[in-house]
Amino acid sequence: MSVADIKKGVEQKMQRSIEAFKNDLAKIRTGRAHTGLLDHVQVDYYGSMVPISQVANLTLVDARTIGVQPWEKNMVAKVEKAIREADLGLNPATAGDLIRVPMPALTEERRRELTKVVKGEGETAKVAVRNLRRDANEQLKKLVKDKEISEDDERRAGDDVQKLTDKHVAEIDKLVQSKEAEIMTV
């Protein structure tokens, strides 16, 4: 394995960590409605559990309401039940074959709790990125030990890995700040 392979691999893994972090952030409910909030809701579709997006059309009715339109009329009750039981604190209301999911306004206390959750998720993501840096540095040390690269090359590559780490940690910080601002906006 070459130095370039190590750097390329660690950058890809760090990018995947950022993507996973973004997905985690998308699941955290803010006062504003977005269809991504229901992405992980599973619906019982003729005996098998499937994502809600495979049995219904999700749209934004307004800034605080998600519209869920099941493709089959007989699925309306099951979809509503799945949303209610998804532990998101949502209370869907059915009007014909359209399910409206209003976003309740967040209390100040709940907003503060959510910002703590966001910070915690951010720290977890940073730890993942730093662990990737550690793994890359260990691989570089192994190359030096096996006399495949010089110590100078290892130091340069280590600096490059540190720059990648700093870049990704800064991106995580930026995502945390924007999510906190979104949560605290009334």
From Swiss-Prot:
A single GO molecular function term of this UniProt record: ribosomal large subunit binding
Function: Responsible for the release of ribosomes from messenger RNA at the termination of protein biosynthesis. May increase the efficiency of translation by recycling ribosomes from one round of translation to another.
Name this polypeptide is given: Ribosome-recycling factor
Top-level taxon of origin: Bacteria
Alphabetic keyword roster: Cytoplasm, Protein biosynthesis
Family: Belongs to the RRF family.
One of the GO biological process terms: cytoplasmic translational termination
Major site of localization recorded for this protein: cytoplasm
CDD domains: RRF
